[in-house]
Amino acid sequence: MARYSSVLPPLDLSISMGEGWTPLFLFRSGGPYYKLEYLFPTGSFKDRGSVLVMTEAKNQGQESVVQDSSGNAGASIAAYAARCGIRATVIVPRDTTEAKRRQIELYGATLEIVDGDRAAAASMALSLSGSTYYASHVWNPLFLEGTKTVAFEIWEQLGFRAPDAVVVPA
């Protein structure tokens, strides 16, 4: 993502784990292309946003962050928080997969499991945000600044032309 630093908020390269520039794979002649975002350091495109969110947390001198997630964003923030030496608490709903829970904990984050859905996890994170930095992948605009770089990459990888369409799984 450093190649796009001129159009991004500050990016601390010491926090970066080489995110960005994932392959654009042509499935067969004439398309479609697939952007292989699972090749990020934590296995998720959410690393694009996490690196900028955690750069800001580090620049502010934050000692801890909180994130609510159903898995991928929590793992990503946990990894980048560890990279920064910042404590992370990740709040997940009870139905979060065991694999995601383990990944979050392997990065050193404190895992809090709440009864209820994503909204319950978000509510708990918001309740803690007065005493810690809320590293939200939903509300923090820096997260979106990072995720937009996928558009720059696709445009560049297609020879500086826009695709006819983009399909994003929900």
Where would I find each of the regions flagged by the language model?
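PLP-dependent amino-acid enzyme catalytic core
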Residues: M1-A170
